[in-house]
């Protein structure tokens, strides 16, 4: 059966609005959730919990993209990189975007309802963080830090779902994830810095100014120190350390990429964070597997 072209076009617009054509954002959300899942489950996470966390991450990342484009609908047409986004280009209306956002959030909440009460309770501030983040760039130069709070919220939820509690190590991992989001989203904001200044959007890339590379470097060191401290606290071994060493290598490579602040290379540095997250998870996975 042939699908009408208009239906295909609409489906494609919704697909792009949810950024399913650009899965990097899913991975940046998913890796910390998987770190938490493996630590909370001591290398043997509950399959049901794992499924809810993974699908929940995918749904809420899509919801976050939709509400972000809704919030930025007046700005996106004036930025070269975002002017062809579905709402900015008139392919999807604001009303349709809000309906899609609600459907995605309700679907994710339906998944959470299969978990314990602590996880359900934690989903409320999580939804608030996701929905409010896009509006912060109007009022503060720290929207990237707020994004970290939103992206990292999967960590306490994962510990709650897996163990029924949120131990100190969960909050340490949350802190590392907030720093990580601050790092990679600042790299992302460096791409749009000139356009953002013109239209009045705030970001850490603008706030940090000529010290952006140095501050990113300090944040990278702090994040790696927290991750190393978590490994020591949990008694993890050499394989985890090897994963962290690989992650540190990716951090150095990212510094090389952003050295001249070229837009294309700043964007490559942002994308490279996928491999940072993968390296940390590989170290965790291998260490728990080796320990049996």
Swiss-Prot record:
- Coiled coil, from the record: none
Q: Which pathway or pathways does this protein act in?
A: Cofactor biosynthesis; ubiquinone biosynthesis
Role description = Catalyzes the prenylation of para-hydroxybenzoate (PHB) with an all-trans polyprenyl group. Mediates the second step in the final reaction sequence of ubiquinone-8 (UQ-8) biosynthesis, which is the condensation of the polyisoprenoid side chain with PHB, generating the first membrane-bound Q intermediate 3-octaprenyl-4-hydroxybenzoate.
Q: Which species is this record about? A: Methylococcus capsulatus (strain ATCC 33009 / NCIMB 11132 / Bath)
According to the record, the segments passing through the membrane are 23-43, 47-67, 98-118, 141-161, 164-184, 211-231, 233-253, 270-290
List its EC numbers. 2.5.1.39
This one is known as 4-hydroxybenzoate octaprenyltransferase
Give the chief site where it resides: membrane
Q: Name one GO biological process term.
A: ubiquinone biosynthetic process
The record ties this protein, via PANTHER family, to: 4-HYDROXYBENZOATE POLYPRENYLTRANSFERASE, MITOCHONDRIAL, PRENYLTRANSFERASES
Q: Which molecular-function annotation in GO is an example for this chain?
A: 4-hydroxybenzoate polyprenyltransferase activity
Question: Which family, according to the similarity comment?
Answer: Belongs to the UbiA prenyltransferase family.
Pfam families registered for this protein in UniProt: UbiA
Which controlled-vocabulary keywords does the entry list? Answer: Cell inner membrane, Cell membrane, Magnesium, Membrane, Transferase, Transmembrane, Transmembrane helix, Ubiquinone biosynthesis
**What is this enzyme's catalytic activity, as reactions?**
all-trans-octaprenyl diphosphate + 4-hydroxybenzoate = 4-hydroxy-3-(all-trans-octaprenyl)benzoate + diphosphate
The prosthetic group or cofactor this protein requires is: Mg(2+)
Q: How does it sit in the membrane?
A: Multi-pass membrane protein
**CDD domains xrefs:** PT_UbiA_COQ2 (cd13959)
Q: Where in the cell is it found?
A: Cell inner membrane
């Amino acid at each position: 059966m042939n699908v009408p072209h208009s239906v295909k076009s609409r489906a494609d617009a919704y697909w792009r609005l949810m950024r399913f054509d650009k899965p990097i954002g899913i991975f940046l959300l998913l890796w910390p959730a998987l770190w938490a899942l493996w630590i909370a489950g001591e290398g043997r996470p509950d399959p049901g919990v794992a499924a809810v966390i993974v699908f929940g991450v995918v749904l809420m990342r899509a919801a976050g993209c939709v509400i972000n484009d809704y919030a930025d609908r007046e700005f996106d047409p004036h930025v070269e990189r975002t002017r062809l986004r579905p709402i900015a280009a008139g392919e999807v209306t604001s009303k349709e975007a809000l309906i899609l956002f609600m459907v995605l959030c309700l679907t994710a909440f339906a998944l959470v309802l299969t978990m314990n009460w602590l996880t359900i309770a934690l989903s409320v501030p999580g939804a608030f963080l996701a929905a409010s983040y896009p509006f912060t760039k109007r009022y503060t130069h720290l929207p990237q830090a707020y994004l970290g709070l939103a992206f990292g919220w999967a960590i306490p939820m994962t510990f709650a779902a897996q163990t029924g509690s949120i131990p100190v190590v969960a909050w340490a991992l949350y802190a590392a994830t907030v720093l990580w989001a601050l790092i990679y989203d600042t790299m992302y904001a460096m791409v749009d810095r000139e356009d953002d200044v013109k239209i009045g959007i705030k970001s850490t890339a603008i706030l940090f100014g000529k010290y952006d590379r140095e501050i990113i470097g300090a944040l990278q060191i702090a994040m790696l120190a927290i991750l190393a401290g978590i490994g020591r606290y949990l008694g993890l071994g050499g394989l985890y350390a090897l994963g962290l060493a690989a992650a540190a290598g990716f951090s150095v490579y990212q510094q090389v990429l952003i050295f001249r602040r070229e837009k294309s290379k700043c964007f490559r540095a942002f994308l490279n964070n996928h491999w940072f997250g993968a390296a940390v998870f590989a170290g965790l996975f291998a260490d728990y597997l080796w320990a049996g």
